[in-house]
């Protein structure tokens, strides 16, 4: 498995989550050898896209899970066999590479079958079928290679040999009893036998013992269009070896193949292997092309993926499969929740307005100047998370760091913020689902599940005609997720307050937390701009009180 570190923000990523991951990846790549890859767990918001576009930075790649996939394994990178390859060549390859089976693929590398040692041995151990070369359409090239033979005369019109294999170990006058037209005859150096076989119109004459037929025999073969080859092996050895010239597609397993995909989870492949008994399994990619094979030992010698979490520490907000990964670091500015790691980690949690402030501090504490792009991303994220220093979560450190980064990025925070918020708060063309889920976070407080979404907008009134439809969606989401209460904050940065919409089984939780009375499931909360500092704490207090009663 490639040794990399994934740096990820939370699900439904906001600007701080995306920008902190990108910038921290730059920091890690400047301070360590192991490559750090920034990733995201959801779509990029309009606001975040504005920041990325302004500084010419690509969005991080999407990461579905950190559970191990087949593509993460050190699989055997073995070129599949072509279907026409001889058993002899296949056996040599498998012996040299210590393989018990090998994939067979067509010219486009699409899987045709699997050739195993048991397929090959069965060909030898089964009752001899003298017509096997005809049935398998064995080529002359395979026969020449297998017998280390040389061609003395070739019938170019005949691609395969239709008859049975016969060792001509009898008198010339007895040949008619055993030889039919089109047969493959193995003979020694007796000219009268060779001539009689040609007259009987065999399709292939194999002369053994390293003997070269006379000119008269060759001329007779040319006249009758008979292919003649010579081999250094004796007749017994030639008859024993010739079966090795069969093409692998004749003996390979074609039906009920069990292949795995590079995108399959290792845990699912383990189940597949427990239910089957193959020694190796072909691996195919998204284009159905063979890329290698794996065996059971590949699943045993696996390593966990390495992850650094930024802007979150709750498992429910993190990447799928986190429990199967190795968390190396957590950089966050939220409450400490249900983190649990197998080893000691670098855990940095500070009560600041933005995780990006902490990431920026990491640069300067280590004497590293962030690039213009990284500085711009961090600056934009701080502006976003602190609502241009208006959020109660904002600290003097956030303001100082933002202005320091702005100098490197070559922007004026106030001017940049105006355009950024304008781009980010537009709800035009968005569906109810897109609006709500753009920045939605679930929380579990004393066993009670709640969810809070937040949308920054400069036009709360323009949204209100959608209120009924939004509340219906919120109730559906609360029921499907088992949430006791669900809330949407429509935050007006300019007027410094939030209109809240509340749904779920227990909307009174919000009323008690904010000491308000909901009218038609909504009310305005003056001065409330921060979900983290002004919404989650009062919700936590009320729920804790209710549970303890």
Swiss-Prot record:
Family named by the database record: Belongs to the PPase family.
UniProt xrefs under CDD domains: CBS_pair_inorgPPase
Gene Ontology MF annotations: AMP binding; cobalt ion binding; inorganic diphosphate phosphatase activity; manganese ion binding
Regulation of protein activity: Inhibited by AMP and ADP with 25% and 35% of activity remaining, respectively, at saturating conditions. Activated 5-fold by diadenosine polyphosphates(Ap[n]A) with n>2 (Ap3A, Ap4A, Ap5A, Ap6A) at saturating conditions.
Subunit-level organization: Homodimer.
Species this protein is from: Clostridium perfringens (strain 13 / Type A)
Domain CBS: residue ranges: 74-130, 252-310
SUPFAM superfamilies: CBS-domain pair, DHH phosphoesterases, HprK N-terminal domain-like
Keyword Repeat: yes
Keyword Nucleotide-binding among UniProt keywords: yes
GO biological process, one term: phosphate-containing compound metabolic process
Signal peptide range in chain numbering: none
Keyword terms of this UniProt record: CBS domain, Hydrolase, Manganese, Metal-binding, Nucleotide-binding, Repeat
Binding locations of AMP: 100, 116-119, 253, 258, 278-280
GO cellular component terms given for this protein: cytoplasm
Cofactor: Co(2+); Mn(2+); Mg(2+)
Protein name (record): Cobalt-dependent inorganic pyrophosphatase
Pfam families named among the record's database cross-references: CBS, DHH, DHHA2, DRTGG
Manner of cofactor binding, per the entry note: Binds tightly a transition metal ion; prefers Co(2+) over Mn(2+). Mg(2+) ions are required for optimal catalytic activity.
EC number: 3.6.1.1
Catalytic activity: diphosphate + H2O = 2 phosphate + H(+)
Entries under NCBIfam families matching the protein: PRK05427.1, PRK14869.1-3, PRK14869.1-4, PRK14869.1-5
